[in-house]
Amino acid sequence: RDAQESRGLGDVYKRQLKYSIYPESLTVSSPDDSLDSQEKFEIGTIDLSQLTTKYLQKLTLPIALPEGYKNISGNTSAMVSFEDAENYTFLSYTVQKDNIRIINAPDNFDVDVLTNELSVNVTGPADEIAALASKDIYATIDLMGTTLTAGLKDVTAEFTLRGTKVRSWMTGEYKVSIQVTERAEDTAN
């Protein structure tokens, strides 16, 4: 039996960034009744760290369905448009060493941040970006699950912007240099 139903295209990563998707829905068929249990199809994820003002105007995501499903509508891609995109901009800021912290370092290692400052790009509403200062940007290096050996290592930093209703985000991937030193074992009895 050919089940056929019209479904919404699903949510693309949505924080406080308003968007619309075209087409809003697809007609999909499946060879069995599995459509009855499908609430939505995810068509993709938008990585905000790669979303610059250039792509805020229009972004295209390919439409791929699970094996066995057929796209009756025929649309091969979805266009994502962001509301107020013309009011978004980006600026560069310098994050100081005091705003870079390490978490989840293994007990048998000492880890020190060597990077004194890091130049980063922030994308967001122009008024919010203009009010942002370097001291409002924090970098965190989470070493959970990272295999460490003594020496110099470049690790990816995750960023947080101070504020409760921040609609801005970091654009790009940033590495911080750390020095890893193995702690001497305590041999005292």
Pin down the residues of each PLM region.
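Structured interface patches
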Residues: 1, 6-189
